[in-house]
UniProtKB/Swiss-Prot annotation:
Keywords: Membrane, Mitochondrion, Mitochondrion outer membrane, Repeat, Transmembrane, Transmembrane helix, Transport. It is a multi-pass membrane protein. Residues 22-37 have a biased composition (Low complexity). This is Mitochondrial outer membrane protein SLC25A46. Pfam families: Mito_carr. Solcar repeats lie at residues 80-171, 299-401. GO terms for biological process: axon development; mitochondrial fission; mitochondrial membrane fission; neuron projection development. Disruption phenotype: Morpholino knockdown of the protein produces embryos with a curly tail morphology and impaired swimming, suggesting dysfunction of neural circuits. Spinal motor neurons have shortened axon tracts due to degeneration of neuronal processes. Mitochondria in knockdown embryos show incomplete fission, abnormal aggregation and abnormal cell localization. The chain crosses the membrane at residues 87-107, 151-171, 183-203, 242-262, 302-322, 371-391. Belongs to the mitochondrial carrier (TC 2.A.29) family. It is found in: Mitochondrion outer membrane. GO terms for cellular component: mitochondrial outer membrane; neuron projection. Residues 1-77 are annotated as: Disordered.
Length: 405
């Protein structure tokens, strides 16, 4: 390997050479023939990096250690707080709607399909008492059954809606400048989605209301298998009272579209009123203060949560009688055994003989009275009371974190 050392390199004396191209007016300095005073003037601290920034005389580039602290102090924490707030609030809402509320949904459905029941559970106190007895007798899993199948049904619904909207001109969402044609197309898309998801919804309903005493441990995809089996007429044998799927299309689509219309209308109305109130309320704190930042972030997230909460509550309450009819038609002929909702210690079979939606409505009104459509209504009170409590706790925690940030 050849050396890269210059031929005339003689240690520090190499600095004594003069380059002809750059020697005009500048003489090279040598350590060998320089005095100590010259060395002190010539050997100084390294100059600042040229071109790094425009420096004046005696200016220095800030040290590397101080740069991160200045950058951190200059960066506002609002963006990180917004991300944390959005994730935390969304997670709390998802947990409340799909996990914490599931025992109330299970008990409500059992009450709706139990035509034997003498106690209608219109009050939340009686509902809580029987739910406690069921949990004490069958274990904590008794009121959490079928939760996986509900997620499967939600996934099938979202996937079907996306596929149909991509393959057809039906709009998946309505713009601000909508017209009647777009509204009709959007509702047709929703109706087709409910028709496709209907057999899987029926299988999920059976998993949620069937008693834990005689129930096996189904897999999370058994809902899909049972739904496809019901479409093709295969799978678990059913009785002759099982209604064909085309008889279930009208109540299923009617309930789904009405629920969507009511919830969407209430949500937009409540969101408009909340934002109008927040924009019209006077600001007592000075701009840029901590309280103003907290209030602005709360106004950005919680109106949507409150609007969604009010929309779901109104839709579930208004459509409770129709939901009772729908669940009784779906469960008929499936040889399902449910818990006795009067006491919570026994099981009962479902042996109804409805011929259709109109016959079911007339039979409930004739045999159980008008309040028979509201069996299990107390569980809705418990469900949305828990939901409101979680929202309030989340708001308090979030406000505390923002004030201490």
């Amino acid at each position: 390997m050849t050396s890269r050392r210059p031929d005339s390199f003689e240690g520090l004396g190499y600095r004594g050479r003069e380059d002809p191209a750059f020697s005009g007016g500048y003489s090279g300095r040598s350590f060998n023939n320089s005095s100590s005073s010259d060395l002190q003037n010539w050997v100084t601290t390294p100059p600042d990096i040229p071109g790094s920034r425009n420096l004046h005389f005696d200016d220095r580039t800030p040290q590397f250690e101080t740069a991160p602290d200045e950058a951190q102090s200059a960066a506002p924490p609002s963006e990180q707080l917004n991300r944390f707030a959005g994730f935390g609030i969304g997670l709390a809402s998802l947990f409340t709607e799909n996990v914490l509320a599931h025992p109330c949904i299970v008990f409500r459905r059992q009450c709706q399909v139990n035509y034997h029941a003498r106690c209608y559970h219109l009050s939340p106190m009686t509902a809580i008492s029987v739910m406690y007895n069921v949990t004490k007798t069958q274990g904590p899993k008794a009121l959490w059954k079928g939760m996986g199948s509900t997620f499967v049904v939600q996934g099938v619904t979202l996937g079907t809606e996306g596929i149909i909207s991509e393959c057809t001109p039906l709009p998946r969402e309505l713009s601000h400048k909508w017209n009647p044609k777009q509204v009709v197309g959007h509702l047709v898309l929703k109706g087709l989605t409910y028709v496709v998801a209907m057999p899987f919804y029926s299988a999920s309903l059976i998993e949620t209301v069937q008693s834990e005493i005689i129930r096996d441990n189904p897999g999370i995809l058994d809902c899909v298998k049972e739904g496809l089996g019901r479409v093709m007429g295969m799978g678990i044998p059913h009785s002759k009272r099982l209604l064909p799927l085309w008889n279930l299309v009208l109540p299923t689509v009617l309930h789904g579209i009405l629920h969507y219309i009511i919830s969407s209308s209430i949500q937009r109305l409540v969101l408009y009123l909340l934002r109008r109130r927040n924009n019209g309320s006077p600001k007592h704190s000075s701009p840029g203060s901590g309280m103003d930042t907290v209030q602005s972030m709360l106004d950005a997230y919680f109106p949507e949560l409150m609007a969604s909460f009010a929309a779901s509550l109104c839709a579930d309450v208004l459509l409770f009688p129709l939901e009772t009819v729908l669940h009784r038609l779906h469960i008929q002929g499936t040889r399902t055994i449910i818990d006795n909702t009067d006491l919570g210690f026994e099981v009962l079979p479902i042996n109804t003989q409805y011929e259709g939606m109109r016959d079911c409505i007339n039979a409930i009104r004739r045999e159980e009275g008008t309040m028979g459509f509201y069996k299990g209504f107390g569980s809705i009170v418990v469900q949305y009371s828990l939901h409101a409590t979680v929202l309030q706790i989340t708001k308090m925690i979030y406000s505390t974190l923002l004030r201490n940030a």
